[in-house]
Amino acid sequence: MTWMVKLLRQMISMQSQYGAALGATCLLHYLTTSLSIRFFFHDLTVRKHEVMPLGMDYYYLYAIGKDPSHPEIRGSVRKILEKYKTKADKANCALALEAISEHARSVYEYFGFKTYLVFQFGVGEVNSKGEPDPQGKGFTAYLMLYHKDADTIFHA
């Protein structure tokens, strides 16, 4: 079983066992214990610090998603992003997240996020849809950042 499949199973298990918020926190701990994931997070952290001014605080938005079995529930991503954008603007800090699809990327761009790193994830483990495939090319993901004054203070 690949680490991606293990990761997805672990995420589903933790979210059903602990609820989405605590499940995401537990998942982050699970992720950071894996050596390959540590390198993944290290590379993203390095890029964040290249872009943002030295010492700038930021909120890391992790595991934003929607339950596909309830398509009638709308606006949850908007509520999350608007709440954290307001908090970040008041505190003069940034928001950071990763988009794992073109659709997610376009949603985040609508809310003012910009892409600062494009990377492949899951090469040799999953295909472009995230399905297990030992010859898979992985999928494209995007490190995205937001700050109310990004155009003047971020270093592209």
Curated annotation (Swiss-Prot):
GO BP term (any one): mitotic recombination
Membrane topology category: Single-pass membrane protein
Lipoprotein among keywords: no
Gene ablation phenotype (knockout): Displays increased levels of spontaneous RAD52 foci in proliferating diploid cells.
Localization (cell): Membrane
Transmembrane segments: 20-42
Any single GO CC term annotated in Swiss-Prot or TrEMBL for this entry: membrane
Alphabetical UniProt keywords: Membrane, Transmembrane, Transmembrane helix
PANTHER family to which the protein is assigned, alphabetical: ACETYLTRANSFERASE, ACETYLTRANSFERASE (GNAT) FAMILY PROTEIN
Miscellaneous comment text of the record: Partially overlaps YOR012W. Disruption phenotypes caused by deletion of this gene may also be a result of a defect in its overlapping gene.
Protein name (database record): Putative increased recombination centers protein 11
Organism, scientific name: Saccharomyces cerevisiae (strain ATCC 204508 / S288c) (Baker's yeast)
Gene name as annotated: IRC11
